[in-house]
């Protein structure tokens, strides 16, 4: 499982292309499309036809635009209920350059629930670092401690 980012501020209107995504595959050497394709299907105009999005492995889970996922970990501990074991936790550092109308995203730890190799839910796991417009913190990394706690 790996995180794939997308390019930000592309073109004269400084648009974002696609969302960051979580990708996985059965082996190494797979083509997830980056940097030619974002979100598996959205071609990056900077590269033209240099890469083909039709052959890229689709992401397992699209993440919120501008969430800035900086760490991805499988929960391997035993402190939390068994339903969390083997699930994916993502430190979302958060947006800083979105328009006020678009709102801020990230500033949380998210959970991607898996059933086998399929993502079945993407939801907040730890929140509270964004209070209105005030930023109280921005998650950067995750560590599952030997006792199963999450740092």
Stretch-by-stretch model annotation:
Residues 1-126, 131-137, 145-147, 151:
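Beta-propeller domain segments
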């Amino acid at each position: 499982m790996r995180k794939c980012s997308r390019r930000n501020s592309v073109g004269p209107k400084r648009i974002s292309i696609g969302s960051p995504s979580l990708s996985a595959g059965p082996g190494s050497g797979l083509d997830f499309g980056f940097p030619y394709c974002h979100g598996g299907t959205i071609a990056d105009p900077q590269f033209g036809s240099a890469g083909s999005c039709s052959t890229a492995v689709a992401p397992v889970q699209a993440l919120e635009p501008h969430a800035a996922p900086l760490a991805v970990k499988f929960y391997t501990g035993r402190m939390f209920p068994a339903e969390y074991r083997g699930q994916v936790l993502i430190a979302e550092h958060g947006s800083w350059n979105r328009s006020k109308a678009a709102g801020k995203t990230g500033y949380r730890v998210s959970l991607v629930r898996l059933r086998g190799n399929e993502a079945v839910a993407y939801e907040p796991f730890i929140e509270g670092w964004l209070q209105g417009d005030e930023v109280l913190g921005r998650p950067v990394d995750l560590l599952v401690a030997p006792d199963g706690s999450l740092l």
